[in-house]
């Protein structure tokens, strides 16, 4: 079986968790607990573009808070 996370023709969601980390998620798989949909189903490239334009700081939110104290 092919990896559903690498299907160039698939539709995906963009998820984010409370740490501000993003995930490209296949649209047909249930969203896991602790993750929120921030970009509805689109093609893989559109979702990757969204992630690239919105996730500019790769540090988890908890680490950003500690470093800014």
Curated annotation (Swiss-Prot):
One of its GO terms (cellular component) is cytosol. InterPro entries: MbtH-like_dom (IPR005153), MbtH-like_sf (IPR038020), MLP_fam (IPR037407). Disulfide bonds: none annotated. This is Uncharacterized protein YbdZ. One of its GO terms (biological process) is siderophore biosynthetic process. Gene3D superfamilies: Structural Genomics, Unknown Function 30-nov-00 1gh9 Mol_id.
